[in-house]
């Protein structure tokens, strides 16, 4: 049984990154354990099912797997599922934690045959650690230095066959030598509203919360295509329904709760609207460089590129061009504004 959620709301309720270690623990309780329970990502699921089946039949380690895509789409969940489906242990770490070659060597030498090593944020591995990883991935061997100064010598250690599962939100930051060593590369895409509604319904059952199909769909529509956000919104809507209603999550109850949270009909919060309004009002619809945009809304460049932009671009409200960011006709419509002739947006997209 999952205990009552006692989390405080994060700064952005629609942020795709975990708000705290408590929320991470709560996510684990809702996480599907097997590939058959995993909703969405049909192409990736189909590929992994075949590759894992073949590896199990041959009693071999699965090829190394690279999972990339925006945060909150299930990369960590898939790593856990791979280990469970293969019937092996999972060892989990992240790129920034592996500061020295010895840190990685300690992990690798403790792996059992065919185990899964999951490295989150693998694009943040230091170059010296990455160099140690290359022979481990190709030949299941590592070279370590013993001693110091003139007495130092290199010792080659054999490793058990293993599977590296790397996850990243910034695939472009991976070095070519590292990327080329992954036999399986999969991009996770944003989820549809129907897929998210299925996830919300399943999570509600685990939380012993009452929800009707329209209530689940309303939450799903505003979850920005991201399961992590959908589950977070569900918990907040459940709180609202228990205090303001009879605990049953209907469409009207979900709408009222999400309005209180300042999440609008397409899943935008204050920061999304602030970014789009800056492009529209301060820069005439664009184009505007990302550094100028960051200064205008008081955010870091990385926050705009990694957190705010992906969903706005994917949904067609913002466009990246060689000259900068441009608001699309959909952005004008969302704010009830006329799309002025001769603006950056109308030149690129027209008034349709």
From Swiss-Prot:
SMART domains: AAA. Gene3D superfamilies: 1.10.8.60, P-loop containing nucleotide triphosphate hydrolases (3.40.50.300), Winged helix-like DNA-binding domain superfamily/Winged helix DNA-binding domain (1.10.10.10). One of its GO terms (cellular component) is Holliday junction resolvase complex. The keyword Hydrolase applies. GO terms for biological process: DNA recombination; DNA repair. It is an enzyme of class 3 (hydrolase). Its EC number is 3.6.4.-. Mg(2+) binds at residue 76. InterPro entries: AAA+_ATPase, AAA_lid_4, DNA_helicase_Holl-junc_RuvB, P-loop_NTPase, RuvB-like_N, RuvB_C, WH-like_DNA-bd_sf, WH_DNA-bd_sf. The RuvA-RuvB-RuvC complex processes Holliday junction (HJ) DNA during genetic recombination and DNA repair, while the RuvA-RuvB complex plays an important role in the rescue of blocked DNA replication forks via replication fork reversal (RFR). RuvA specifically binds to HJ cruciform DNA, conferring on it an open structure. The RuvB hexamer acts as an ATP-dependent pump, pulling dsDNA into and through the RuvAB complex. RuvB forms 2 homohexamers on either side of HJ DNA bound by 1 or 2 RuvA tetramers; 4 subunits per hexamer contact DNA at a time. This is Holliday junction branch migration complex subunit RuvB. It comes from Cupriavidus necator (strain ATCC 17699 / DSM 428 / KCTC 22496 / NCIMB 10442 / H16 / Stanier 337). The lineage of its organism: Bacteria, Pseudomonadati, Pseudomonadota, Betaproteobacteria, Burkholderiales.
